[in-house]
Amino acid sequence: VLMKEIREFAIDHYGALGDGVTLCTAAIQQAIDAAAAAGGGRVTVPAGVYLTGAIFVKSHVELDIGEGAVLQAVVDEAAYPSIWTRVAGIEMMWHSALINVCGQRGVTIRGKGVIDGQGEYWWHKYWGTDRLGGMRQTYTAQGLRWAVDYDCKRPRLLLVNDCSDVRVSGLTFVRSPFWNVHICYSEQVVVDHLVIQRNEGPSTDGIDIDSSTNVLVEHCEIDCNDDNICVKAGRDADGLRVNRPSVHIVIRHCTLGRGGGITLGSETSGGIRHVEISDIMLKGTENGFRLKSARTRGGTIEHIRVRNLHMTNVRNPFSFLLNWNPSYSYARLPDGCSGEVPEHWKVMAEPVHPPERGIPEFRDIEISQVTVTGDLDHVNSRSQAFEVEAYPEKPIRDIRWSHIRMTVQEAGYIAHAQNWQMDDVVVRTVEPTPLRLDNVVNVDVPVFVNLADGEGWEGTDG
């Protein structure tokens, strides 16, 4: 069988200079456009530092960023023209990403090169040089914490939106202004062997999977300042309007460092179903497996399978906060707000009717083969096994736990839960405080062993 030869389009042949000074946006886009016009091809980025604004990859194009090559985001807001997109659960106008794949199919973005977002400008714009100022401080003082992320509009590094048959492989992502990799409204996407690091800024999520189907994430190493890997499905009234779930998601064989762990939510409006998470190493993350939502999100999260997690120095191995971060989660126009407000403020503040439609449902979750260890004098030593709070009217239910060993500082708490089964679950604690239980029905508790005396004891109502 004769293999069809893949035509190559080297960006330096179109005028790109890898000197870290010359703006190469137009040259890179010309190479991509030429490959697309030829019916497809490989756009190659040789070694060098290529300063660029937003580029748009087209169907049947492979963008190959070679070893020693850096695509470096130019620090210029005008270089990222606004596009209609979903971001953080809302459809609105937002700066385009550095690399955009929108409405395309058969695209590969690969190589051993680096995508550098030069995010410090955007981080400082958001929260100042000391993380206490910037737009965040100004907005929070006015009761607008919920709006600041949506007004700052920091670019993502890679956006795959409304696409099918896309692969992202081998690259290193650093210093993202906002999320690193966003997979939205897409299907048949593979993300593998990425390294995501040097993301000290706010909301620098590693990989976000948003209202997408048949997505595989594997063999990635992620260190960031928010959720390492997150599955989302829209926010509040706008997310319920769109009503697109994330379904058939596989996350496996990844190593996660600093960050929020593996998260479902808080954008849950379209529903999240059939998610398989396995063979994950978590080292020093804030959370291990995390569920979060809010009273206006809605959606059903079900058929979730989690197995073979190994956590070291993780503060909250299991954090299920379904009324998460109210100052961010609930959009409310301030009293006395006069004059014109941004259109996306109105979208965010639109109430959910009837109100009970906004209460999410979490059910049918299996968690097995988990170990939690660590240095109890570590910075994350105030660890607790369970951080769980759902809703009195809609408890988190039908959770099956098996073959789990945790060594933590405290037992923690479980509020508003129903039908939890535990098989071979043992928790070793430093503090003798019992597991606090509130409004639980038919909920098994682990075997607890206090490290001070080695005796087993079980949780009590409190």
Language model: regions and residue ranges:
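Extracellular/periplasmic carbohydrate-active domains that bind, remodel
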Residues: 1-462
